[in-house]
Amino acid sequence: MFGAIAGGIASALAGGVMSKLFGGGQKAASGGIQGDVLATDNNTVGMGDAGIKSAIQGSNVPNSDEAAPSFLSGAMAKAGKGLLEGTLQAGTSAVSDKLLDLVGLGGKSAADKGKDTRDYLAAAFPELNAWERAGAGASSSAIVDAGFENQKELTKMQLDNQKEIAEMQNETQKEIAGIQSATSRQNTKDQVYAQNEMLAYQQKESTARVASIMENTNLSKQQQVSEIMRQMLTQAQTAGQYFTNDQIKEMTRKVSAEVDLVHQQTQNQRYGSSHIGATAKDISNVVTDAASGVVDIFHGIDKAVADTWNNFWKDGKADGIGSNLSRK
């Protein structure tokens, strides 16, 4: 109803404007054919104005008080009328919408209607709103939080992997160290065993040589002492042991005294013969006693020297090198 009222008001206003703009109120100048004259001296035809005009122009008889419009004025009038009518129509629509909005009956825009429809569907059918459930309507902060959580999980996985790798490497290093330690112990044991075997062999060989020297009656006492000392010093140098000149002189003196003692022992009742090499048994006993005799020369000298030579001369039968001044 209010729309019709507003439209009527706008139409009335438009009509008034049109009548003011295009012609109303002008009268045509009198002149030309007047009265009922059909022919005059000026060749004008006169008859009833209404009849002639009706015959020529048909039933649409123009007003005799109005001037006939020209072509230009008619075209301008039509164009202006169309423009004005369009403008007035738009203005009328705007005024109508405004009046309807004021009384609460105005229409809504397409965007507002779409929003209303969306809100209605979301409230009425929440299970159909898959787009919202998928998180499409979430804010960018939620997306950032999700990315941060993913990064945390990835970092945790990387740290866990590095920890596992480090533990595996540590276990591997332990196993390698254990294998190397066991191998080293075995090698050390084998080396010690080999060294002991070599030492025992060298000890027996030295003892045999000393016995051989002592059995050689063709050698004088001084020669026997010199040979024994040479054998002992060679044995020491092979083991990396060296003596000073004073130590060598002291050992030479001891060896000389021990050689005299060995000769005296070979003539006692134990062997029953003055000849050292008379029998194999006698020779074996002489070897043992000779070795013991040679070892005993270290009594009374420095303990470090005695300990060193003890490693070379003690074979289980002999007593080895004793320390200071103790003697059997």
Curated annotation (Swiss-Prot):
InterPro entries xrefs:
Microvir_H
The alphabetical list of record keywords is:
Capsid protein, Viral genome ejection through host cell envelope, Viral penetration into host cytoplasm, Virion, Virus entry into host cell
Q: What does the UniProt entry say about where the protein is found?
A: Virion
User: What GO biological process terms are annotated to this protein in UniProt?
Assistant: symbiont entry into host cell
Under Pfam families, the record lists: Microvir_H (PF04687)
- Subunit structure, as described in the record: The virion is composed of 60 copies each of the F, G, and J proteins, and 12 copies of the H protein. There are 12 spikes which are each composed of 5 G and one H proteins.
Query: What's this protein's name?
Result: Minor spike protein
| Organism per entry | Enterobacteria phage S13 (Bacteriophage S13)
Supply the source organism's classification.
Viruses, Monodnaviria, Sangervirae, Phixviricota, Malgrandaviricetes
